[in-house]
Amino acid sequence: MPISATARPTIPPTVWATRGRYVGERAEETLRSSLSTLKDAGDIDDFLELPADDTKPDLVFESRTRVGDGVTVRARLSLAPATGKGRDWLLVAEAERPRDRSWPSPVTMFWPAEPDAGGSHDPASGLRPGEICPLPEDDKAVRRLLRDCARDPWYIHVVVHEAMTTDERGRVPLAHWLPLGLRDRVVEHRATPQQYRVTNWALRDVDVKVPRGGAAVLPGRPAPEGYEPDAFAVRAVFLDGTEPVDLVDAVSRYDALPRELPQEAAEALTALREDWHLLTLAEELERERALVAMYAEALDAMTKSRDLYREAAERAHEALEAYREAGTVTPSPL
């Protein structure tokens, strides 16, 4: 199949990319305090706030940690200026090897983990990942919300229909059963028994149908290659406090699909790779050696160019002398 010239790259297996919104006050102070606490506790190795840039309004923070058996993860978070809805942020992180879902989310390398910290909200819906989010009571609001969430390229949106009113056992969030690396990426929408029709009516444009008493993973936009609505619909989710194995599997399979790298994330990833400041001593030495090698190569090239130029000039001079000695008249340049 031919590849479109406009096709965007997919997210590399070593990379996380997400965005969020801070809805509280004093976002900068919260972020700085959280980073200091994380470093003091040994949860991150180090962090750095980059100097303000007059040409860019965002504040930029870098954080580095080790996960698993010592795999280094570098992360970059940019915090946008405040708006009436809060302060949006964009995070990209890259590990030394393909990411593992059992590793903590890079969001925890910056923001406090407390539910009331205000750091992690989905800008598209205003909802907080990792919690149960009931659908609005108003039908039009349901349609608007699900329409927007079905096209969200950043988060994984899951709609669960309650076959009957649940008790406390049924109010365990899906995130409770998910690997650490997915808990900050999944937004769980809950539809009441009476909202079965309006839920599916709202999703008809993306060809998704939530089974009665079941669940569905929404496609996002663009839908990842390999996504088929039926393959990511779960026929029955028992909200009785037991692990929803089939739904966890559907979310994990969706997360494994190759997804397009959003333009904003691509730019942030380039900055992470090419303009990283939070270096270890070994990394600083390596960078200095690379700079010395680069300068040496440039000097060598200049020297060779100079020598070639001098050699060519000498040959031209010799040829001119030979013409003169042979009595050849040199043509006028005019």
What are these regions (language model features)?
Residues 31, 61, 73-77, 89-93, ...:
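Long, contiguous hydrophobic alpha-helical segments, chiefly transmembrane helices and signal peptides
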Residues 1-190:
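N-terminal, leucine/charged-rich tether regions that mediate assembly and partner docking
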Residues 116-286:
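Acidic, Ser/Thr/Pro-rich intrinsically disordered low-complexity regions
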Residues 329, 333-334:
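Extended, charge-rich intrinsically disordered regulatory tails
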Residues 264-308, 312, 316-319, 326:
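Heptad-repeat coiled-coil/leucine-zipper oligomerization helices
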